[in-house]
C-alpha cells in the first residue's frame, strides 16, 4: 500500500503554474510539473501537462510513456514522473524537479531508472523551489520522526515557513510512504 500527501501553494505569485498529478489505478503514478519556472514563449499550462499525462499514464510501458512526454513537451519543460508497481519504482526526471528517498535512515536522490522499494521507504517529490529552503539533514530528520506522509509534509512546510513565511513563489510537492 502507498500512502501519499500532496502540497500545492501559490505563494506571492499571481497564479499557480505548477501541477501535481496523481493516479492510483492501474498503477500509482505521480508527476510534478514545474511550470512556474518556464519563462519563455513556449509555456505549457498545468492543465495541458495533466491532460497529456492522463492520455499516456495508462500505458503499460513506462519508458514509452516517458518518451511520449519527452517528445510532446518543449525541451525547457521541467517535470518528474514516478510509477510504483508492486515492490519497484520507476523514475523519469527532466529538469528541476527531484525525488529524494529515505531508505534505512539515509536520504538519497532518486535518479532516472527502476529501483526496488521496501516497507517504510519514504519518498519526497518536489520542485527546486520547494527544496531551496530545506537541507538534506532537515528533510531526513522530519522523515525519521514522522509516522505519516501528512506529518512529514507539515514539518517540512513549517521549516520553509520559518525562513520565508511561504512568500517564495509556487511550492509543489508530494510525499509517499510505502506500507
Predicted regions and their residues:
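N-terminal entry segment of metal-dependent catalytic domains or homologous docking segments
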Residues: 1-54, 88, 92, 97-116
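Structural motif
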Residues: 3, 28-30, 35, 80, 84, 90, 126-127, ...
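Charge-dense, low-complexity intrinsically disordered segments
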Residues: 39, 56, 60, 143, ...
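Short amphipathic alpha-helical segments
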Residues: 41-48, 61-65, 148-152, 156
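Catalytic core of PPM/PP2C metal-dependent serine/threonine phosphatase domains
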Residues: 53-102, 160-178
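C-terminal catalytic subdomain
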Residues: 69, 118-124, 129-179
Amino acid at each position: 500500500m502507498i500512502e501519499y500527501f500532496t502540497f500545492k501553494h501559490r505563494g506571492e505569485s499571481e497564479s499557480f503554474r505548477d501541477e501535481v498529478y496523481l493516479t492510483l489505478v492501474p498503477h500509482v503514478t505521480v508527476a510534478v510539473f514545474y511550470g512556474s519556472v518556464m519563462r519563455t514563449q513556449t509555456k505549457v499550462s498545468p492543465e495541458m501537462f495533466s491532460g497529456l499525462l492522463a492520455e499516456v499514464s495508462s500505458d503499460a510501458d513506462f519508458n514509452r510513456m516517458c518518451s511520449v512526454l519527452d517528445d510532446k513537451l518543449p525541451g525547457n519543460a521541467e517535470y518528474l514522473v514516478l510509477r510504483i508497481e508492486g515492490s519497484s519504482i520507476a523514475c523519469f526526471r527532466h529538469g528541476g524537479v527531484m525525488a529524494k528517498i529515505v531508505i534505512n535512515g539515509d536520504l538519497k536522490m532518486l535518479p532516472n531508472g527502476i529501483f526496488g522499494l521496501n516497507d517504510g521507504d519514504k519518498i519526497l517529490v518536489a520542485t527546486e523551489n520547494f527544496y531551496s529552503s530545506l537541507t538534506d539533514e532537515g528533510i531526513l530528520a522530519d522523515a525519521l520522526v514522522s509516522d505519516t506522509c501528512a506529518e512529514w509534509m507539515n514539518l517540512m512546510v513549517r521549516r520553509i515557513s520559518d525562513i520565508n513565511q511561504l512568500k517564495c513563489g509556487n511550492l509543489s510537492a508530494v510525499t509517499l510512504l510505502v506500507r
